[in-house]
Amino acid sequence: IKLADKQALMGMKKSKHYTLLAHADDSNNRKGFMRNAVGFELSKMIGMTYTPNAKPLELVLNGDYVGLYFLTENIRVDKDRVNIVEQEDEETDSEKITGGWLVEIDNYDTDPHITITEGGDVYTMWVTYKTPGVLSSQQEAYLTQQITMLDKLIYGDKNSDELWQYLDMDA
C-alpha cells in the first residue's frame, strides 16, 4: 500500500508505505493467519532485532468480503527497521558482496529478482532483492550460491549441524 501522505494506520508509526499480508497458503485463512500471528509474536519474544508491527484486519473491498489479512510495516533498510550497511549497486569486489542484503523469497515472479531452480525444475524459488537495487553478475552469482546452499542445508540431512555455521542466531 502506498499512500499519498504519511498516515498512522491502526496505531502504527506514520508512514506512506504499508503491506497487506495475505494468508495465501490457506483457503479459509485461519491456519495461515495463526502461523503468521505466532511467527510475529515469537520473533518479538525471542528478541529479534527487528519485527515489523502487524495488526490483523478483515478486508472488505467494494462491499465484498475479501478475507483476513495483516496490515504490516513495510520492511526496508532504516536505522529503526533493518539496520544494515547497504551494498553499492553493481558491486564487483568480492570482499564487499558478503553482507548488506535485503531479500525476500516470494511465490511470484516480480522484478527485480533472481530465479533459483533446483532438482531439474522440481521447484522454482524467486528471490526479490530490495537492496542493492541493481546487481552485478558477481552479486547475482553470490546471492544465488548462498540461497541455494541454505536451501539444501534446510531441507537436507536433518542430523547435520552444518546449517548452524551459517546462521547468526545472536544477530
Q: For each of these PLM feature ranges, what is it?
A:
Residues I1-A171:
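Phosphate/dinucleotide-binding and metal-coordinating scaffold of catalytic cores
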